[in-house]
A protein has these predicted regions:
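Short aromatic-glycine-(Arg/Gly/Cys) micro-motifs in beta-strand/loop hairpins
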Residues: 1-12, 37, 41-77
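A short, charged, amphipathic alpha-helix used as a generic interaction element across diverse proteins
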Residues: 15-37
Length: 77
C-alpha cells in the first residue's frame, strides 16, 4: 500500500527529476547533519509532476491542507 503524506513544497531540502540524484542529495545532507530527523524521498501524486523531493520525515502531515501538496513516499532515509 502506498504511503501518502502532505508537505509544503517550499520546505523541500532538495528537488530533482532523477531519483538517484535526489537520493544522493539526501545522503549528502544526512552525512552533514546526522542528528536531524530522518529524511524521506517523495514523488507528487499528481501525474503532471514527475520529479522527486527530499523532506524531513517529521514535517510530514497525514491531513490535507490548502498550502500542502500530496506526495507518495518513495524511500525513508
Amino acid at each position: 500500500m502506498d504511503e501518502i503524506v502532505f508537505f509544503n513544497p517550499g520546505d523541500a531540502i532538495a528537488n530533482s527529476h532523477d531519483f538517484g540524484e535526489a537520493l544522493r542529495s539526501a545522503q549528502i545532507y544526512r552525512t552533514k547533519d546526522s542528528l536531524q530527523s530522518p529524511l524521506v524521498i517523495v514523488k507528487p501524486t499528481n501525474d503532471k509532476d514527475n520529479g522527486f523531493s527530499v523532506y524531513f520525515a517529521d514535517d510530514a502531515d497525514k491531513n490535507a491542507a490548502p498550502d500542502k501538496t500530496s506526495y507518495k513516499v518513495q524511500k525513508h532515509i
